[in-house]
């Protein structure tokens, strides 16, 4: 019994450490063009919001509009370089395909429904940088809510 409890504890610790590590990562840092997009916008990694900050919405209250816009421009750069966006226009089908490939989501998955809702919510925005950050923030917030609801289930 003690061994079983120890295994449960270790599993929980690893899961918590993994989630903490992911939330500390910078948004977009997993993409190949991350350094290029930072350089194109004269930013450093210190200027970019963390995944945890964005998924919790803290980025909106802890930073000025210019910081929000600059982070959005890096996100737009990444989306454009990956062929998912051109200017302020999404390629919704490519975004969906890329998201499914990255997350392993299956048809009917709530994460895909959340992605679709986020694209719908932001599709009419004209500023490409603000639009990109809002899309990323919307998806990260939805994923956090879904993860929390799945843990409680």
Swiss-Prot record:
Function noted in UniProt: Colony queen number, a major feature of social organization, is associated with worker genotype for Gp-9. Colonies are headed by either a single reproductive queen (monogyne form) or multiple queens (polygyne form). Differences in worker Gp-9 genotypes between social forms may cause differences in workers' abilities to recognize queens and regulate their numbers.
GO molecular function: pheromone binding
Signal peptide location: 1-19
A Pfam family hit: PBP_GOBP
SUPFAM superfamilies: Insect pheromone/odorant-binding proteins
Record localization: Secreted
GO biological process, one term: social behavior
Disulfide bonds: 37-77, 73-129, 118-138
Originating gene: Gp-9
Domain of life: Eukaryota
Main location class: secreted
Lineage, broadest ranks: Eukaryota, Metazoa, Ecdysozoa, Arthropoda, Hexapoda
Protein name (database record): Pheromone-binding protein Gp-9
InterPro entries, per the entry: PBP/GOBP (IPR006170), PBP_GOBP_sf (IPR036728), Pheromone-bd_protein_Gp-9 (IPR022354)
């Amino acid at each position: 019994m003690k061994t079983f409890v120890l295994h449960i504890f270790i599993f929980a610790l690893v899961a918590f450490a993994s989630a903490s590590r992911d939330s500390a990562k910078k948004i977009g840092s997993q993409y190949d063009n991350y350094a290029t997009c930072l350089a194109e916008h004269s930013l450093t990694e210190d200027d970019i919001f963390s995944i945890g900050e964005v998924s919790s919405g803290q980025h909106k209250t802890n930073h000025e509009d210019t910081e929000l816009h600059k982070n959005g421009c890096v996100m737009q750069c990444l989306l454009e370089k990956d062929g998912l966006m051109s200017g302020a226009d999404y390629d919704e089908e490519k975004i969906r395909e890329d998201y499914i490939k990255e997350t392993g989501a299956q048809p009917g998955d709530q994460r895909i429904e959340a992605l679709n809702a986020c694209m719908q919510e932001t599709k009419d925005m004209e500023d490409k940088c603000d639009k990109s950050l809002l899309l990323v923030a919307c998806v990260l917030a939805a994923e956090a809510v879904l993860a929390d609801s799945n843990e409680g289930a």
